[in-house]
């Protein structure tokens, strides 16, 4: 499939979209999604814990297993969670596993894109492979009349690729490629997320985001003389909270505080909860036996699912 028509279509869509008033608010803030849509009510059931520990889809799979099958598969998971292979699962290892389970869609996306970029099959995606697969012959035939600078886009991608390339060999392994495609998920990539956001919003090129640039990124008032209430609220937010040093503009640190807030760490809280509830000898870490013994806290099975079905039936 040729890339040029796709890229041109994208460019035209963006130009068309930018010419229409934007009523709905654009949100650049990166928030962690909740671990589960269920209420965390362990006195009634462990549905929240199951979805937090496994992810929603995998939790449903466990609900169809017998208790014996559920325990066996849980035991296999424990061996993966115990990264340092010391025979224990620490709070930190549990936290990392929960985060991994919650972000499984990201890894699925990376796997899908990986197949289209690792052309030589060496298990790495080089910068050249990515650039050629993404931009193709646009490199040789840029069209400046469409208002887009593809060379500028390539330069921006290359900068992000190099930031994700921790060993600086211009070849990305799976983890580095994940950081490149989803930089907001990695601490060492957060500065590039901030920089790219500022470049998008900073129209006068002074390296800051002023009030009008901030509002202009969220709302296009063309053809609409009156501002929605949320726009007036955002003006107040900028003045009272975003611009912390009160100089009328946001610098890099203020922008970072805005788009990458320090949210409550749900994964860490759940990891501590699971360890506390299962830690029989209270040494602050879990053995495989301790986890499997409390298997119904971590995973479901036909037995727990049937029990909850009976409980729901009794309510009626």
UniProtKB/Swiss-Prot annotation:
Transmembrane segments: none annotated. Keywords: Calcium, Endoplasmic reticulum, Glycoprotein, Golgi apparatus, Membrane, Metal-binding, Repeat, Sarcoplasmic reticulum, Secreted, Signal. A motif (Prevents secretion from ER) lies at residues 313-316. Pfam families: EF-hand_5, EF-hand_8. Ca(2+) 6 binds at residues 279, 281, 283, 285, 290. Residues 1-19 form the signal peptide. One of its GO terms (molecular function) is calcium ion binding. Ca(2+) 4 binds at residues 202, 204, 206, 213. It is found in: Endoplasmic reticulum membrane; Golgi apparatus; Secreted; Melanosome. Residues 69-104, 105-140, 152-187, 189-224, 230-265, 266-301 form the EF-hand domain. One of its GO terms (cellular component) is sarcoplasmic reticulum lumen. Ca(2+) 5 binds at residues 243, 245, 247, 249, 254. Glycans are attached at residue 132. Involved in regulation of vitamin K-dependent carboxylation of multiple N-terminal glutamate residues. Seems to inhibit gamma-carboxylase ggcx. Binds 7 calcium ions with a low affinity. This is Calumenin-B. It comes from Salmo salar (Atlantic salmon).
